[in-house]
Amino acid sequence: MIKLKNVTKTYKMGEEIIYALKNVNLNIKEGEFVSIMGPSGSGKSTMLNIIGCLDKPTEGEVYIDNIKTNDLDDDELTKIRRDKIGFVFQQFNLIPLLTALENVELPLIFKYRGAMSGEERRKRALECLKMAELEERFANHKPNQLSGGQQQRVAIARALANNPPIILADEPTGALDSKTGEKIMQLLKKLNEEDGKTVVVVTHDINVARFGERIIYLKDGEVEREEKLRGFDDR
């Protein structure tokens, strides 16, 4: 499902070469839940951006759903992001002027243009809000009328709109209190176990990381170690 092969990412600062990632190898199976941990500057976000086709490696190969993404052009990368990956961010990134329902409809508008009716869009968006466990009575609320946890549920529903096989979550509980954060992680776990989504979570919180089946620890751009928490194959 997701494969990084000898991936290196460098940036140039003056005459100095900075290694954000250094010869990283990673395999994530379809339907797996993997957490990525490490201190600030360890390369967590860079790795997630490369997996999410938001950035390209300096060296190495990246495969998403058996598609090598290195040589894809911008339009092809956009299609990969649109169809195969749902993004969940720490700060929710909802459009403040739109309702919860309209925020979830946006990916459907971009994908289907006029090929999906407004009624079909609304039905799918409501389905996604239900999957994200947000009560329908909040569908017409704007983000500033929702709690942080409710906003993150809307963001998860938006990530599900185009039914991608992969969910990438960058510090999904970072802006939430611990109780609400745990509920959000339980939701991601449910989407993984019941709907078969491949989930990759970047976090600095070990309690969040332990929702995964294994934890990849990064340090100075390299995979320092891996911890297996429970058996993916034995589910």
Swiss-Prot record:
Gene3D superfamilies tied to this protein: P-loop containing nucleotide triphosphate hydrolases
Organism domain of life: Archaea
Keywords: ATP-binding, Nucleotide-binding, Transport
A single BP term in Gene Ontology: transmembrane transport
Recorded GO CC terms: plasma membrane
UniProt-annotated binding residues for ATP: G38, P39, S40, G41, S42, G43, K44, S45
Annotated GO MF terms: ATP binding; ATP hydrolysis activity; transmembrane transporter activity
Residues of the ABC transporter domain: 2-235
Keyword NADP: no
Residue ranges the record marks as coiled coil: none
Homology family: Belongs to the ABC transporter superfamily.
Listed name of the protein: Uncharacterized ABC transporter ATP-binding protein MJ0796
Organism for this UniProt entry: Methanocaldococcus jannaschii (strain ATCC 43067 / DSM 2661 / JAL-1 / JCM 10045 / NBRC 100440)
